[in-house]
């Protein structure tokens, strides 16, 4: 049951109150948004229409690009609009919707990145069983599991917020609706809920990151017996994936693996994984992957 509340809308402080800085942020975030959406859509189109990119790795990469496109579209347009004027109001329902979608996509991406590491583990450590293990049916099931995990995670987070009474103030010291800034506005003791947030968000991030790290340790040990060319190709693919993992996981662990309090650096960290990481992902995968670059060139010639 929802807790009683007097608050019908929130006001976001954003990243800066300086009009000149706001104009600079508008141009910067508009450029980042266009590059992010354009780059990720280009990867989706390239994988969809390129017969040479039919392996499970690219199947998962297309879904990662789709999630990053949605993630950027969930966060950045509101931030761009808020940079143009001082009124940064968002309805209570709109705040919860943004919060739910962000955690849905974030939770799904965390699990999908772990699935992609498992795909690389099977391809490198058990190559003879790769085609029989990573069938199209298995890939679809793994993507479905990632989405289901994201739904369960975001639903649990939303349930925690709905238990909070909001009686005022209603000014969020952030540029997005997230748990810790909302916990600060609740007119009740939030210690227990803060621990549940750490258990739900922080532990999930940490456990998945540890599984990813363990899989790459096994992969690196296996690569010692491969040829120099085989090591180079595998390290190129795995290096791109691990870079994406580090860019997404490290900020998330920093934010959620600590008590429910906000730090001055939290906004900068949030900009990194909410706004910049979805832009970096397509750049990392295309610049370090010859197959993707060649497929893009072939599509361009057509």
Swiss-Prot record:
Organism: Mus musculus (Mouse)
Pfam families (UniProt xref): 7tm_4
Intervals, Cytoplasmic compartment: 46, 117-139, 213-236, 288-302
Name of the protein in its database record: Olfactory receptor 4C3D
Residues with attached carbohydrate: 6
Extracellular topological segments: 1-24, 68-95, 161-191, 258-266
Alphabetical UniProt keywords: Cell membrane, Disulfide bond, G-protein coupled receptor, Glycoprotein, Membrane, Olfaction, Receptor, Sensory transduction, Transducer, Transmembrane, Transmembrane helix
Top-level taxonomic group: Eukaryota
Coarse class of the protein's main subcellular location: membrane
Protein's GO biological process: G protein-coupled receptor signaling pathway; sensory perception of smell
GO MF annotation list: G protein-coupled receptor activity; olfactory receptor activity
UniProt subcellular location: Cell membrane
GO cellular component, as recorded: membrane; plasma membrane
Membrane topology: Multi-pass membrane protein
Keyword Disulfide bond: yes
Family to which the UniProt record says this protein belongs: Belongs to the G-protein coupled receptor 1 family.
Keyword Membrane: yes
Disulfide bonds: 95-187
Main function: Odorant receptor.
């Amino acid at each position: 049951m929802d807790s009683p509340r007097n608050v019908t809308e929130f006001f976001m402080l954003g990243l800066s109150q300086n009009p000149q800085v706001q104009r600079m942020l508008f141009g910067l975030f508009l450029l980042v948004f266009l590059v992010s959406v354009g780059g990720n859509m280009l990867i989706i189109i390239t994988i969809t229409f390129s017969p040479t990119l039919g392996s499970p790795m690219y199947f998962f990469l297309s879904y990662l690009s789709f999630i990053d496109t949605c993630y950027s579209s969930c966060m950045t347009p509101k931030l761009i609009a808020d940079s143009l004027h001082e009124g940064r109001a968002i309805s209570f329902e709109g705040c919860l919707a943004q919060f739910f979608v962000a955690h849905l996509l974030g939770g799904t991406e965390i699990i999908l990145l772990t699935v992609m590491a498992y795909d690389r583990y099977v391809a490198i450590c058990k190559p003879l069983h790769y085609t029989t293990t990573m069938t199209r049916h298995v890939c679809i099931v793994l993507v479905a599991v990632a989405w289901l995990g994201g739904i369960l995670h975001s639903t649990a987070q939303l349930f925690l917020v709905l238990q909070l009474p909001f009686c005022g103030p209603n000014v969020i010291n952030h540029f997005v609706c997230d748990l810790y800034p909302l916990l600060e506005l609740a007119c009740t003791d939030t210690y227990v809920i803060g621990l549940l947030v750490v258990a739900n968000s922080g532990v999930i991030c940490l456990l998945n990151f540890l599984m990813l790290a363990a899989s790459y340790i096994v992969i690196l040990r296996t690569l010692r017996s491969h040829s120099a060319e085989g090591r180079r190709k595998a390290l190129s693919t795995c290096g791109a994936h691990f870079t994406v993992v580090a860019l997404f996981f490290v900020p998330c662990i920093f934010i959620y693996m600590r008590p429910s309090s906000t730090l001055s650096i939290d906004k900068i960290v949030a900009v990194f994984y909410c706004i910049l990481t979805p832009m970096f992902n397509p750049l990392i995968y295309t610049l370090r992957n010859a197959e993707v670059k060649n497929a893009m060139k072939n599509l361009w010639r057509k």
